[in-house]
């Protein structure tokens, strides 16, 4: 359920949130997931829907299961952002910061390794925070998944300031990326 939710939701999220008019003109390309184009926010919605369907089918507590998914999600985020770094995807803005990286596959400029910032904060730090808080709040369904959403959104919003905006979307209101608005 979750794998289908993240793949279908991630793809549809990218289509709707990031490139709607392109796919409106090229609807069959929606199915070409090997060409890239996934959205975390769409994947999140897909996972929520898949979890809802699963918990309804088996008469289980929805928020208890979203808590369990939220405990594991940072591992997937960590691995996904490391893969983005390796593939020179979703790279950061140009900088002379000490931790800058030359993405020679892109343009041979030194840039923020924003994927690594995200893998650290949205992956490792979020995993530690949620698993620590699980000990205190495991008996209250929905608390951990709510904290996941709060911390993920906070980390993503801040780190997006170092990330290169999507070329076809640019900056919104002269300051925010589309990812920040969705977060």
Identify the meaning behind each predicted range.
Residues 1-183:
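A feature for loop-to-transmembrane-helix boundaries and adjacent hydrophobic helices
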């Amino acid at each position: 359920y979750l794998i289908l939710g993240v793949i279908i939701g991630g793809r549809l999220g990218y289509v709707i949130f990031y490139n709607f008019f392109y796919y409106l003109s090229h609807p069959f390309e929606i199915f070409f997931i090997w060409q890239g184009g996934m959205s975390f926010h769409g994947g999140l919605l897909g996972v929520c829907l898949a979890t809802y369907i699963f918990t309804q089918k088996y008469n289980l507590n929805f928020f208890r299961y979203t808590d369990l998914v939220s405990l594991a999600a940072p591992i997937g985020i960590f691995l996904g952002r490391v893969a983005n770094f390796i593939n020179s995807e979703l790279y950061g803005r140009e900088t002379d910061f000490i931790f800058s990286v030359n993405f020679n596959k892109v343009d041979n400029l030194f840039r923020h390794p924003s994927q690594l910032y995200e893998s650290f904060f949205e992956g490792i730090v979020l995993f530690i925070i949620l698993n620590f808080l699980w000990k205190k709040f495991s008996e209250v369904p929905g608390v951990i998944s709510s904290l996941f959403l709060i911390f993920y959104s906070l980390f993503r919003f801040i780190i997006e300031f170092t990330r290169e905006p999507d070329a076809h979307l640019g900056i919104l209101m002269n300051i925010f990326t589309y990812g920040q608005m969705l977060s």
